């Protein structure tokens, strides 16, 4: 199941739709997660242009009144059969089955809070839900926190946010999926950080052909 994740920073522009469609077609994407979409109305009708066909389904979390946030998960219904949907103000969690492998699992798209308190509360909410679901997990997200000081330019110590993120990953038995080709996923002027990442459990790693 080929997955695409993108902090799109606003989905309103037409060229973004064409870029998404190109990725979906070239990489044969069957699951897509978008965050910071800033959309306040359903884009279900627009998704056909992005996906390229009608064999898809979506789940949406709208942006706030200040046009912040927004999360979208979209998937190929021929590949991934969703049986249950969960969502919060900045995340979507889908229970389902990867059809070709008869692999029951849980796939999530997450956009972390900028502030530590909000992020910690979201992590706790997600942890309780994922432990209750008790299925192999794959999470794609911009968590708005780094895991190690080396993931942020000019960061030299492990702060409280990093420790909480690390403990959350350990509590859920997740593995940080290595990135290839890029070291940082966010930049502003001279500031650079690795905020976007994929996390999965051992069962996903053992079934890497999925």
List where the protein language model places each region.
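A shared catalytic/ligand-binding motif for oxyanion handling
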Residues: 1-210
């Amino acid at each position: 199941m080929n997955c695409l994740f993108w902090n799109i920073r606003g989905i309103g522009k037409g060229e973004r739709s064409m870029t998404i469609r190109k990725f979906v077609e070239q990489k044969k994407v069957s699951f897509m997660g978008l965050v910071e979409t800033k959309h306040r109305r359903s884009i279900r009708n627009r998704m056909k242009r992005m996906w390229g066909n009608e064999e898809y389904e979506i789940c949406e979390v709208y942006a706030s009144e200040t046009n912040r946030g927004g999360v979208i998960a979209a998937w190929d219904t021929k590949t991934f059969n969703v049986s249950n949907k969960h969502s919060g103000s900045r995340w979507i969690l889908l229970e389902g089955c990867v059809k070709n492998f008869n692999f029951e699992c849980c796939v999530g798209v997450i956009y972390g809070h900028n502030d530590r308190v909000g992020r910690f509360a979201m992590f706790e909410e997600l942890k309780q839900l994922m432990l209750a679901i008790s299925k192999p997990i794959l999470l794609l997200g911009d968590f708005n926190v780094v895991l190690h000081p080396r993931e942020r330019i000019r960061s030299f110590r492990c702060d409280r946010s990093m420790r909480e993120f690390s403990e959350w990953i350990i509590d859920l038995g997740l593995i940080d999926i290595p990135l290839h080709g890029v070291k940082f996923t966010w930049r502003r002027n001279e500031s650079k950080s690795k905020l976007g990442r994929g996390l999965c459990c051992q069962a996903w790693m053992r079934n890497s052909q999925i």
